[in-house]
């Protein structure tokens, strides 16, 4: 896949079984210049399984702006992958500022679909799937949890 465009590839990764990754995702990961991930130690399990050796940059909420500055000079000339520890990046994960940075600079960006926990959770729930709301991880404080529960109860949609 050496004909990849320079830009950002948001790549879904397996949730539990490493073999759930797509062939396309593996080929792109083999072709990128570097990979932005949450936890390099965790990501290496996947990458090593498929013989992928790339420079890894760790991304967290606290270092996202710094990471953007760090890669800024190479954004126009690099093929970059964004992965998370499990599933689809950006769903309850850091990275939206990075994506917004690429959008603001009118740089190429695409999503490589794959494993996600949302659809299986909906499928196995037995609830209607035509309309639903996703709330991510629950808050930590009891007060915030109560507010969220009230919001979910009153929304009238299948809620995750």
What do these predicted regions represent?
Residues 1-62:
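Glycine-rich, flexible N-terminal cofactor/catalytic loop recognition
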Residues 2-6, 119-160:
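Beta-strand/loop-alpha-helix module characteristic of Rossmann-like adenine-cofactor folds
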Residues 57-65, 137-142:
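Conserved helicase motor
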Residues 68-76, 153:
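Short amphipathic alpha-helix with an adjacent loop that forms part of the alpha/beta core around
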Residues 76-135:
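Short glycine-cluster motifs
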